[in-house]
Amino acid sequence: MTHYIQGQWHTGNGHDVTSINPANGETIWCGKTATAEQVNTAVEAARAAQFDWFMLGFDARLAIVEAYRSQLEANKAELAETIAQETGKPQWETATEVGAMIGKIALSAAAYHKRTGTEANDTPAGRAVIRHKPHGVVAVFGPYNFPGHLPNGHIVPALLAGNTVIFKPSELTPKVAELMVKLWDKAGLPAGVINLVQGEVDTGKALASHPQIDGLFFTGSSRTGHLLHQQYAGHPGKILALEMGGNNPLIIKGVQDIKAAVHDILQSAYISSGQRCTCARRLYVEQGEQGDALIALLVDAVKQIKVGPWNAQPQPFMGSMISETAAKGMVAAQANLLDLGGKVLVELTHLQAGTGLVSPGLIDVTAIDVLPDEEYFGPLLQLVRYGDFDQAIKLANQTRYGLSAGLLADSREDYDYFLARIRAGIVNWNKQITGASGAAPFGGVGASGNHRASAFYAADYCAYPVASVEADAVSLPATLSPGLSL
């Protein structure tokens, strides 16, 4: 059974789809896509369930969401293994993803009250009350790189606010989505409150274009996000939250502990095989002996990164990319940069045919006058040597994206200078730029988003404010307005 609609599992009426373990090419899931008719049934189920779900009240909704957290705790080993099998990420990393899913419950409950709670104040005109109400029926489109944590970051706050959800996961990670929804079912979520439709582009289009959804929350590529933005033009009544990619810069300046700096570079560029939207894509290192020493250490460290299957022992740092197609795409990206004048310092290679296993790459692109402003979504880091700090910041800002950026520097003054000038929604100092806090907003500017930050601020796009002026009874004012008599 592939789809979960109105509290029941259904076989799809579309074409066959499979999910492949990218580390060995084995099929680990198969099903049939949802047709437009099945998507419509899911939307109707969500619509029918929405008002009753809202009227349960926050405390009752929270109790069910906390029951889901208990299910995550009880099934965390199975969920972590499923994520590892389907994405190719090593088990140590998928265990941290499940931990983030569990932690999201308390953070989302806190965010609900802080960002969208109820506030009342007595004023001369009456009691002024600010409340928040759910949008209604929302679609959640999940990505493949964090198939549990990232859609979870939309679904949990949406449900807490009183919305109902149609979840359309990446077609590359359907098994993770199926397990997540089974845990929601075990938690006692009422029928129709969450619905799962699996499929590819046609399924996604049917859901995104459905006239009865009130909002769409998307995490994925900038290209798809821009298409959704165009589609929603002229529909101001629908809320659209886009969390997209980045061509993220990391600048190194005056760091004495170059070993620590190299560690932060590795964690920024190569974790998750470079498949995080916040991964460093461009590295700016000072010209001179100190920069030379750092690069020499970095080259050696990149060459020593362990790559292997998700379940290899001892565990690798990098697992497989999501697919062989993705791996070949990174080889092609490297070749393109070489054609433009780049110089390989560590070659990215496709390690095994039929898999997504690649080695990490490092390429010096200083000689390229105009770098392609592309998000190469994999373990390929572009190095640029710079002369002065202003030049580095100027180059770092030469991107249409604006998701994450970072500075490794011993000087607080340098960081303050950088912070004032860099254009990004996540700006870190002396920390990996893939590091983000669930207690803070997560999002970018430019081609990285549409000013709908997620994580702690996800509550903002899950509800709308309702302002009221209230009194317990109708009463005449002490003085009537001019021209009135009663």
Curated annotation (Swiss-Prot):
This protein's pathway: Amino-acid degradation; L-arginine degradation via AST pathway; L-glutamate and succinate from L-arginine: step 4/5
Enzyme class per UniProt: oxidoreductase
Catalytic residues (positions): E243, C277
GO biological process, one term: arginine catabolic process to glutamate
GO molecular function, one term: succinylglutamate-semialdehyde dehydrogenase activity
Stored InterPro entries: Ald_DH/histidinol_DH, Ald_DH_C, Ald_DH_CS_CYS, Ald_DH_CS_GLU, Ald_DH_N, Aldehyde_DH_dom, SuccinylGlu_semiald_DH_AstD
CDD domains recorded: ALDH_SGSD_AstD
Binding site residues for NAD(+): G220, S221, S222, R223, T224, G225
Cysteines joined through disulfide linkages: none
UniProt entry tagged with the keyword NAD: yes
Keywords: Arginine metabolism, NAD, Oxidoreductase
Keyword Transmembrane helix set for record: no
Source superkingdom: Bacteria
E.C. numbers: 1.2.1.71
Function: Catalyzes the NAD-dependent reduction of succinylglutamate semialdehyde into succinylglutamate.
Family recorded in the similarity comment: Belongs to the aldehyde dehydrogenase family. AstD subfamily.
Protein name: N-succinylglutamate 5-semialdehyde dehydrogenase
This protein's encoding gene: astD
